[in-house]
Amino acid sequence: MNIRKPLCSNSVVGACTLISLTTAVILGHLMLRELMLLPQDLHESSSGLWKTYRPHHQEGYKPGPLHIQEQTEQPKEAPTQCDVPPSSRFDCAPDKGISQEQCEARGCCYVPAGQVLKEPQIGQPWCFFPPSYPSYRLENLSSTESGYTATLTRTSPTFFPKDVLTLQLEVLMETDSRLHFKIKDPASKRYEVPLETPRVLSQAPSPLYSVEFSEEPFGVIVRRKLGGRVLLNTTVAPLFFADQFLQLSTSLPSQHITGLGEHLSPLMLSTDWARITLWNRDTPPSQGTNLYGSHPFYLALEDGGLAHGVFLLNSNAMDVILQPSPALTWRSTGGILDVYVFLGPEPKSVVQQYLDVVGYPFMPPYWGLGFHLCRWGYSSTAIVRQVVENMTRTHFPLDVQWNDLDYMDARRDFTFNQDSFADFPDMVRELHQDGRRYMMIVDPAISSAGPAGSYRPYDEGLRRGVFITNETGQPLIGKVWPGTTAFPDFTNPETLDWWQDMVSEFHAQVPFDGMWLDMNEPSNFVRGSQQGCPNNELENPPYVPGVVGGILQAATICASSHQFLSTHYNLHNLYGLTEAIASSRALVKTRGTRPFVISRSTFSGHGRYAGHWTGDVRSSWEHLAYSVPDILQFNLLGVPLVGADICGFIGDTSEELCVRWTQLGAFYPFMRNHNDLNSVPQEPYRFSETAQQAMRKAFALRYALLPYLYTLFHRAHVRGDTVARPLFLEFPEDPSTWSVDRQLLWGPALLITPVLEPGKTEVTGYFPKGTWYNMQMVSVDSLGTLPSPSSASSFRSAVQSKGQWLTLEAPLDTINVHLREGYIIPLQGPSLTTTESRKQPMALAVALTASGEADGELFWDDGESLAVLERGAYTLVTFSAKNNTIVNKLVRVTKEGAELQLREVTVLGVATAPTQVLSNGIPVSNFTYSPDNKSLAIPVSLLMGELFQISWS
């Protein structure tokens, strides 16, 4: 063995003294930088849902006062095995900057490394673990009906307080493609995430994986049986399990990693010493910061197009470190290590397997897929009515009108301004009469400012004990938009009933259709509370992840505050999810139809109850481009109903930016234009006629494609598919697709290539191998009531790709959308609302392969009823093309689907002009064939709910 002495042996002590002094200065600077407060942190700004509670600490535990003196670390011998490749060094000083002497006293190696860093990089560690660093030892391994159990023991404590020296390992081989293992304290109940997950009592019969264990140092090694590739190897660094610091590291089989949302980043994450922090935070998106949601799940692509995923079911504040070796380290501040490994083997299957655990997405109402419009500053019903009238007059679709805080009385939930919104209920009823819906903002914080008896939500909440409490048992009081506020505890069953009552009572006054949940990280304009926070170990843990503001209570409530299930320290990242669950439940019980909830804060499993918008994005080309990986990321995380504020929220947009953003936004699963009070208005009708024409064209295309989009949501709901998806999900064997995040697919069939830079009239995109047909060849304008301006420029009818980057014409009025060979998609005549568009005739676009084949399907129901699958109240029709013939198959037909009229079929890829076209055996005389585009347009008069056959020869 090649043994190296630690740096600064006696022979070079003089030089090393100088190095140590320099290092101390640098580390001091870095420590200040890590704890630096942002300006907004330095002042105040104007049911059976859960498993059994398991508290974080032992029964009866209360957090004690913080002892300010530094934790005494038992000095260890300086290591002699420090010849570790730089990319494989694991940080031995994650908690603070330390000197060489302190590092070596921990038994670790110290080698300075000069680097220039850019967020989210943290840099190569100077103090790192030697291979011989003590960890846990595996003992008493035994087989069980579902896997294995073992005891893990540590003989020497670490440098974190309250080590748990004896642990229990439970390994569950749950399915052939899912492995589940837990590491926890057998002697003390600790907090576990109360997420409803599958319980499996038997061992998988034919797993795709093998599991191995390293005895000392302890580790779990997971391999693919086919090929033997190591997917998980936790022996690469020591395991830590202290009361408030848990660390688990693993090697990675490749550097192609995605997931770990929510962050402003490319689709593929950097493994160049990147730190990803998960602690939900109200802050405008910027690189290297913790944002509104936490999803501790990653998907890794492997050579050959295989993929696997790993999910750490832990809701505590955490960092995830990615390093070049490649390797990943989880660092959590509490809970247990509850790990799922998904074997795929293809990326699509990994996502489905993850959703098998956290839940499949909810099925949105059809109207929710239309266009939504909002602005902070619609300050009266007169203004809202004028906006709606302007949208109609200028022929822009509008399905859902929204209001921000403006509608409220003193910015309090479940109230409305009796002056500027005096006829609020009438306004909402008028929207309904015109076939539209209405949504408004609801913040979780409840005003506590008024005298007793003046505000029912607070009075009732106090009486029923629904608020989060401080160390004295009284409601914790913070400050949000209405002034002083209390925060509902949505883990309390009583709170769910209280919230439902408040929603129902307000709905009886104002018949709104959905709820927009904002500020639910939860956000707080003071740190912790009006009275501050206790000085205890939950507020000042021994390890603080890289959160904005440097402390957990920054811009939120005290970590040590009390909730029904545990402390906020454990439950903070679940706050948005629990409010979404409560709101979805309240809407179902109040309205009796499918709920529609959009929430800013999210956690794993959120898509089961609600959608998401990406927060306070800026009106910039940079944020336009970042919205593509944002939307793709949330689809991989099981939240397909997602979108960014079209044209941007913060700052003034430009005409060109708003046109390009509207074109891309037409392909967000959730399409909303919304902006800030202090920014210029940006409704579509505000711009020049040229810009309006370009936007109308994008609107018309989206509304024409809604039947296909709705079918994709059905597949997401029943199968765990994505709606918007990255190219690698469909083409995993093509490595060129892996990092593509300036394009997106809708399902398997539509490829969208937006313009994301100013001043461009062409765009470059990657086209996987095959034929891609330009959707400009498919027109359904004549079927609807919404005219779509035709493009003034010529276009390329089809792309024949060998798997290559291609440059396409993209004038201002055009977003390139291509239909993939082998697919049939349903379309419908577009109108100003989905209420009207659902009444229009339908069409099929058929994209033939070289062998003349294609397939597709249509899912249809009434668009808003509950339990349509359970009641069989839906229509499902499949389509197939082969041998110059298109036929349908009726899987199930109900009244609504039976009445759908099919009026137009466009067949793409017809090599030669036909001489005869038949519809159910009857000749069609007025078909048209384009020899230039190789397209065949067939007018028909058929019903989707009846068998048909269309052929040409």
UniProtKB/Swiss-Prot annotation:
GO terms for molecular function: alpha-1,4-glucosidase activity; carbohydrate binding; glucan 1,6-alpha-glucosidase activity. Its main location: other. Its EC number is 3.2.1.20. Keywords: Disulfide bond, Glycoprotein, Glycosidase, Hydrolase, Lysosome, Membrane, Signal. It catalyses: Hydrolysis of terminal, non-reducing (1->4)-linked alpha-D-glucose residues with release of alpha-D-glucose. Residues 1-27 form the signal peptide. GO terms for biological process: aorta development; cardiac muscle contraction; diaphragm contraction; glycogen catabolic process; glycogen metabolic process; glycophagy; heart morphogenesis; locomotory behavior. The active site is at D518 (nucleophile), E521. It is an enzyme of class 3 (hydrolase). GO terms for cellular component: autolysosome lumen; lysosomal membrane; lysosome; membrane. Glycans are attached at N140, N233, N390, N470, N883, N926, N933. Residues 80-131 form the P-type domain. Essential for the degradation of glycogen in lysosomes. Has highest activity on alpha-1,4-linked glycosidic linkages, but can also hydrolyze alpha-1,6-linked glucans. Belongs to the glycosyl hydrolase 31 family. This is Lysosomal alpha-glucosidase. It comes from Mus musculus (Mouse). The gene is Gaa.
